[in-house]
């Protein structure tokens, strides 16, 4: 479930508003992990404000924005206090009660405006009067018992829907974080679907160095447990509070990480929708510790051109088009721009005493580049912010264009242009694999859970425009173009041939999943062993040429040289493949043909991530 979302409240809790509203001398919070709190309710805005509010540095009060649950009552204008020339001293106040949730739909429509309608009650959910929903199964599959594999330790964080604990792997002593979501608190069908989608998205984004990695999801009668990477270094939020603001070089380095995450999400068809400093954690306490993005509770799968209407996010970071209830993935870029602004000066670009005032400033306020420390900030940084914090999303830079901006290249470590998309990179690596490895990935893909491949399923449907269950050359070409992957026709043809394992001339669903699967899946011993057993038909512990021929027949692969296939993997030259040789082949890093950019993503999948 998501963190804190826009809603009718007066309290300014740390998780809901910028940490700048806390005193800069305040002690940083303890190391945190993603928690589960409330979702959003609609924000009702006047169709036309009576007058344009002054910039934050002026003293005239902002025109209030009315926040109410629909149908909205007729608002009575209330005078607002005059905005001070600088943000007021921060105050910690209790977190607000959770607002009512907005509706979402699981199946995305064609690239048109998404209608928010209440989903029908699934058959596996029973409604009871005293406890909202009685959920029989959230994950819709039987899972292992969490406590058979992990020991739960101290509490790391608390949210509206659940609690995050330290957990230890009983097998190897590794430390992780476990977010336990209480099923009794999932009051609506949408709450249940949101939990499923968050897990699906975490699996879909797996492997990115700056996105928190998921270890697995478990379910018992009481809760859904999500085990993930432990980030013990605390929030980016707290470091901003501690520092006041970063040096320009430090800010550029963090900005690159944040925007690269946004670009990767967009290229894989995911919109985060709640980017803010609280949702970035450091792995450790070191100054140069890696930064990880967390909390995908408000995130959605999207298709190019799709329009969303539900108002979600956090007040200081929400894009103006979100408040106007018509937005797409460009809203994430606005939120990233707000974070960059804060990194450079320590205060948000649009602020006021109340949420109503904040929303009005987001819609109509003026960027302040006059107050300290802006006279000492480079023109390049200000140029980037002017191009990111532009209210017309069509004129706003994309995440890819932000990464290519000269200011983010000032340290010399910016990515080369053009960047590969996440999917294009995976496609290219897949194309360079030997046939045995491709077949093994197909076996692994067919045994993955629904939540692990849900994102890839959405991408397949996006590319399969005629709903035939097959992607032909023209559909692959159009799909790559939609996500900004500019490729020569010869390259696309090579990718097509590489993914088409059975040489049918098209890419079917199973071939697409295998080719776009992130290779972190092959790190799991159970996946590797299951794949090896598929080829080792007689259970002898070896894959022989006869067994390999049988597997090729099952996959419809003809004209193969079995000796060459075995020879590529057979390290001891005994004419067969044992389990250790098989694992070495599967875990060997593969470099795709003509690979550009610095991505370490794998296979066919990265073909869809170039210019978001």
Curated annotation (Swiss-Prot):
GO terms for molecular function: ATP binding; calcium ion binding; calcium-dependent protein serine/threonine kinase activity; calcium/calmodulin-dependent protein kinase activity; calmodulin binding; protein serine kinase activity. SUPFAM superfamilies: EF-hand, Protein kinase-like (PK-like). Residues 150-408 form the Protein kinase domain. Ca(2+) 2 binds at residues 500, 502, 504, 506, 511. Ca(2+) 3 binds at residues 536, 538, 540, 542, 547. It comes from the Eukaryota. A lipid is attached at residue 2 (N-myristoyl glycine). InterPro entries: CDPK_Ser/Thr_kinases, EF-hand-dom_pair, EF_Hand_1_Ca_BS, EF_hand_dom, Kinase-like_dom_sf, Prot_kinase_dom, Protein_kinase_ATP_BS, Ser/Thr_kinase_AS. Its EC number is 2.7.11.1. It is a lipid-anchor. Residues 23-132 are annotated as: Disordered. Residues 451-486, 487-522, 523-558, 561-592 form the EF-hand domain. Pfam families: EF-hand_7 (PF13499), Pkinase (PF00069). Residues 414-444 are annotated as: Autoinhibitory domain. One of its GO terms (biological process) is intracellular signal transduction. It is found in: Membrane. Ca(2+) 4 binds at residues 570, 572, 574, 576, 581. There are 3 contiguous domains conserved in the CDPK subfamily: a kinase domain, an autoinhibitory (junction) domain and a calmodulin-like domain. The autoinhibitory domain (414-444) inactivates kinase activity under calcium-free conditions. Belongs to the protein kinase superfamily. Ser/Thr protein kinase family. CDPK subfamily. This is Calcium-dependent protein kinase 27. It comes from Oryza sativa subsp. japonica (Rice).
């Amino acid at each position: 479930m998501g963190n804190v979302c826009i809603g009718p409240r007066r309290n300014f809790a740390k998780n809901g508003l910028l940490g700048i509203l806390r005193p800069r001398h305040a002690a940083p919070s303890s190391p945190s992990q993603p928690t589960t709190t409330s979702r959003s309710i609609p924000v009702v805005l006047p169709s036309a404000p009576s007058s344009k509010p002054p910039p934050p540095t002026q003293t005239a009060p902002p025109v209030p924005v009315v926040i109410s649950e629909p149908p909205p009552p007729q608002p009575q204008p209330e005078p607002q206090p005059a905005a001070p020339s600088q943000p007021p001293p921060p105050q910690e106040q209790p977190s607000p009660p959770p607002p009512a949730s907005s509706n979402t739909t699981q199946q995305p429509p064609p690239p048109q405006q998404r209608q928010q309608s209440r989903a029908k009650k699934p058959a596996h959910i029973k409604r009871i009067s005293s406890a909202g929903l009685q959920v029989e199964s959230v994950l819709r599959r039987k899972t292992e018992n969490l406590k058979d594999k992990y020991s739960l330790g101290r509490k790391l964080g608390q949210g509206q829907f659940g609690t995050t604990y330290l957990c230890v792997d009983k097998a190897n002593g590794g430390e992780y974080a476990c977010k336990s979501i209480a099923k009794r608190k999932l009051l609506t069908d949408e709450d249940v679907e949101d939990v499923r989608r968050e897990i699906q998205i975490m699996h879909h984004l797996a492997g990115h160095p700056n996105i928190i990695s998921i270890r697995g999801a478990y379910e018992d009668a009481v809760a859904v447990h999500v085990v993930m990477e432990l980030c013990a270094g605390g929030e980016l939020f707290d470091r901003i509070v501690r520092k006041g603001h970063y040096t320009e070089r430090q800010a550029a380095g963090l900005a690159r990480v944040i925007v690269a995450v946004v670009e990767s999400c967009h290229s894989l068809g995911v919109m985060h929708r709640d980017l803010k400093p609280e949702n970035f954690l450091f792995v450790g306490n070191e100054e140069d510790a890696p930064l990880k993005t967390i909390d995908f509770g408000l995130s959605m799968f999207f298709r190019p051109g799709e329009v969303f209407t539900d108002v979600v996010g956090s007040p200081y970071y929400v894009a103006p088009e979100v408040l106007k209830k018509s937005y797409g993935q460009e809203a994430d870029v606005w939120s990233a721009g707000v974070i960059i602004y804060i990194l450079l000066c320590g205060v948000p670009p649009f602020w006021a005493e109340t949420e109503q005032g904040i929303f009005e400033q987001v819609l109509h306020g003026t960027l302040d580049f006059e107050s300290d420390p802006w006279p000492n900030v480079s023109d390049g940084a200000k140029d980037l912010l002017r191009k990111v914090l532009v209210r017309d999303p069509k004129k706003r830079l994309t995440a890819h264009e932000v990464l290519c901006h000269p200011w983010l290249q000032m340290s010399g470590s910016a990515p080369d242009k053009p960047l590969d998309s996440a999917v294009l990179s995976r496609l290219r690596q897949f194309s360079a694999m030997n046939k045995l490895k491709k077949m093994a990935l197909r076996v692994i893909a067919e045994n993955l859970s629904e939540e692990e491949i849900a994102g890839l399923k959405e991408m397949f449907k996006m590319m399969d425009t005629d709903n035939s269950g097959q992607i032909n050359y023209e559909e692959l070409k159009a799909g790559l173009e939609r996500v900004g992957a500019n490729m020569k026709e010869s390259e696309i043809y090579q990718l097509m041939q590489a993914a088409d394992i059975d040489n049918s001339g098209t890419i079917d669903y199973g071939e697409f999943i295998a080719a776009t699967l992130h290779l972190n899946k092959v790190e799991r011993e159970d996946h590797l062993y299951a794949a090896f057993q598929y080829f080792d038909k007689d259970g002898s512990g070896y894959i022989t040429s006869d067994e390999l021929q049988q597997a090729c027949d099952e996959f419809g692969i003809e004209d193969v040289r079995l000796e060459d296939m075995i020879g590529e993997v057979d390290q001891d030259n005994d004419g067969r493949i044992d389990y250790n040789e098989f694992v070495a082949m599967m875990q060997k890093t593969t470099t795709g043909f003509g690979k550009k950019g610095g991505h370490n993503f794998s296979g066919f999948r990265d073909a869809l991530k170039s210019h978001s």
